[in-house]
Amino acid sequence: MTENKTFYITTPIYYPSGKLHLGSSYTTIACDVLARYKRLMGFDTFYLTGLDEHGMKIQRKAEELGMTPKEYLDPMAADVQELWKKLDISYDKFIRTTDTYHEEAVAKAFEQLLEQDDIYLGKYAGWYSVSDEEFFTETQLEEIFRDESGNITGGIAPSGHEVEWVEEETYFFRMGKYADWLLQYYDEHPDFIQPEVRKNEMVNNFIKPGLEDLALTRTSFTWGIPVPSNPKHVVYVWFDALLNYITALGYNSDNDSNFKKYWPGINMVGKEIVRFHTIYWPIMLHALGLPAPKKIFAHGWLLMKDGKMSKSKGNVVYPEMLIERYGLDAVRYYLMRAISFGQDGIFTPEDFVGRINFDLANDLGNLLNRTVSMINKYNDGKIEATGVSTEFDASLEEVVEETISHFHKAMDKFEFNVALADVWTLISRTNKYIDETAPWVLAKSEDDKAKLNNVLYHLAENLRIAGALLQPFMRATSGKIFEQLGMDERSFSLENLSFGYSFTHPVVAKGQPIFPRLDVEEEVAYIKLQMAGGVLPEKEWVPEEVELNLTLPQIKFDDFEKIELKVAEVLEVEPVEGSDKLLRFKLDAGDSEPRQILSGIAQFYPNEQELVGKKLQIVANLKPRKMMKKYVSQGMILSAEFDGKLSVLTVDDDVPAGSLIG
């Protein structure tokens, strides 16, 4: 890894106003996907997230609850970090703006700008929203309240929150001084703001009409960072909050090595705070003599059919509910695949369940199940590239190369949905390849053995590549794919990913489906009920309607009565010479003499002596058969198979040997 191959990505720091819903998780997962991708591409990566913990709103809320702000904040900070853990977020640092190092660095930066005359003391009079922690002019208000005389008494901010009139002494930042510089910077760095439409909004709506100076401090509350030279002022939230992206790296501290190493980086934000990040933030950095971020990417909102998520609307989706019922990877996949990053997207339970069934269960899950089954069935679990190709191999390998190339291009442009669509193009093409080559037909002829093995290799290798590309999005799923393909590796670098891996171990036996199919009607109803805050009633049990999961045809009770099941105590057990699968049991099954049974379970019981004294369940009236030329097996030991493992069936110790089962 070269020293300058670094990557720094940040989420906005979240405001601790209660339980985070799926929208906040959306941003954090997107940044995590990008961070994981860059690490797999060999970049020294640093991923920052955290909480914005100062301000009037927090102070008021804590006072209402009879708590200090810190007492109010600490449990919420712990809850957010626990949620990120559930979402498998691989952040490198979690910043809280109440951290001492951050407060000290912000205070130093403020004093520097004050000395440079970029900040001056003045008086502010205007409309302020406590909820938004933002000042508004009358023209910016969505609605204005007036008294009988026509005087303005209040109003509604664009966010829907009420504003109040504020008059107080404040320090201002000379934003207008840097307006021309900022426009020139935009021109010289056309990719600085993404998507492009966000830049046009900033230029036309805020900069060209005249950039107003920005209030930086408040005196009407105390929960903030005091200005060292005038402690009755506390630093206003946006100067405090924006600097977190560099203070977390050690800026203005005794150890700024990470700052020198990683800055500038990429700030990922929601479109509602794009103005603060694309106008105020680069100007503040420029005034401090620091480079602007490499890029500000302002993504869209995750909406419901009836607009933004809101408890009052009964349409809030919490990620914990989805993870608990459908698994983390299904949630991460849906958010990154169903929504074009940068645009608004709509979450619907129907689309969510449909994606799981069609994309994950049908396309990916089915391909893995079929591939593992055929490799075990037709080639004893071995994956071999024989070089005897079919007429479809060249076009398939071409799709692999195109998929890898397109995937990297999409990831570099933050087009996560496009990157996943590329992977599914490969998965779909590989499913088609099975139908084209018909391995079950090739298996009928020994002459086609080499061609069959080559087909199986292509299936396994395409799954490996798909699994590798899915690592940033669905780490656990990738691991399951690698495991079922019998691979020791649980992670693959993406730097030089290409077709042609050498498989060295047998494929494991087919496990449980990685994504079981869902009952659409039932799951959609469940999600909608949870969104409304309800509890799903237990489904009435109707035995006659239960679909039995059977692998063999049903038998009549008369047939079952022909089988005699007994309890047998293990007296002795030893490996059978010349076989690595068989164990030879000497059993007390209530007969006049001990009986002998040979069972192919040696690989599951490397210490076979642990079975001595156990009381097993056996089929006692199975016709004796000769095995290994010199042994007679007088029955069958019953066992259960699960996840590629096997366990003998036992009974309680106080059940006598020879007891009938049934």
From Swiss-Prot:
<dbReference type="InterPro" id="IPR004495">
    <property type="entry name" value="Met-tRNA-synth_bsu_C"/>
</dbReference>
<keyword id="KW-0694">RNA-binding</keyword>
<dbReference type="InterPro" id="IPR014729">
    <property type="entry name" value="Rossmann-like_a/b/a_fold"/>
</dbReference>
<keyword id="KW-0436">Ligase</keyword>
<dbReference type="InterPro" id="IPR014758">
    <property type="entry name" value="Met-tRNA_synth"/>
</dbReference>
<dbReference type="GO" id="GO:0004825">
    <property type="term" value="F:methionine-tRNA ligase activity"/>
</dbReference>
<dbReference type="GO" id="GO:0000049">
    <property type="term" value="F:tRNA binding"/>
</dbReference>
<dbReference type="InterPro" id="IPR015413">
    <property type="entry name" value="Methionyl/Leucyl_tRNA_Synth"/>
</dbReference>
<keyword id="KW-0648">Protein biosynthesis</keyword>
<protein>
    <recommendedName>
        <fullName>Methionine--tRNA ligase</fullName>
        <ecNumber>6.1.1.10</ecNumber>
    </recommendedName>
</protein>
<dbReference type="Pfam" id="PF01588">
    <property type="entry name" value="tRNA_bind"/>
</dbReference>
<dbReference type="InterPro" id="IPR002547">
    <property type="entry name" value="tRNA-bd_dom"/>
</dbReference>
<feature type="short sequence motif" description="'HIGH' region">
    <location>
        <begin position="14"/>
        <end position="24"/>
    </location>
</feature>
<dbReference type="GO" id="GO:0006431">
    <property type="term" value="P:methionyl-tRNA aminoacylation"/>
</dbReference>
<dbReference type="InterPro" id="IPR033911">
    <property type="entry name" value="MetRS_core"/>
</dbReference>
<keyword id="KW-0820">tRNA-binding</keyword>
<dbReference type="InterPro" id="IPR009080">
    <property type="entry name" value="tRNAsynth_Ia_anticodon-bd"/>
</dbReference>
<dbReference type="GO" id="GO:0005737">
    <property type="term" value="C:cytoplasm"/>
</dbReference>
<feature type="domain" description="tRNA-binding">
    <location>
        <begin position="559"/>
        <end position="662"/>
    </location>
</feature>
<dbReference type="Pfam" id="PF09334">
    <property type="entry name" value="tRNA-synt_1g"/>
</dbReference>
<feature type="short sequence motif" description="'KMSKS' region">
    <location>
        <begin position="308"/>
        <end position="312"/>
    </location>
</feature>
<keyword id="KW-0030">Aminoacyl-tRNA synthetase</keyword>
<dbReference type="InterPro" id="IPR012340">
    <property type="entry name" value="NA-bd_OB-fold"/>
</dbReference>
<comment type="similarity">
    <text>Belongs to the class-I aminoacyl-tRNA synthetase family. MetG type 2B subfamily.</text>
</comment>
<dbReference type="InterPro" id="IPR023457">
    <property type="entry name" value="Met-tRNA_synth_2"/>
</dbReference>
<dbReference type="GO" id="GO:0005524">
    <property type="term" value="F:ATP binding"/>
</dbReference>
<comment type="subunit">
    <text>Homodimer.</text>
</comment>
<comment type="function">
    <text>Is required not only for elongation of protein synthesis but also for the initiation of all mRNA translation through initiator tRNA(fMet) aminoacylation.</text>
</comment>
<dbReference type="Pfam" id="PF19303">
    <property type="entry name" value="Anticodon_3"/>
</dbReference>
<keyword id="KW-0963">Cytoplasm</keyword>
<keyword id="KW-0547">Nucleotide-binding</keyword>
<dbReference type="InterPro" id="IPR041872">
    <property type="entry name" value="Anticodon_Met"/>
</dbReference>
<feature type="binding site">
    <location>
        <position position="311"/>
    </location>
    <ligand>
        <name>ATP</name>
    </ligand>
</feature>
<keyword id="KW-0067">ATP-binding</keyword>
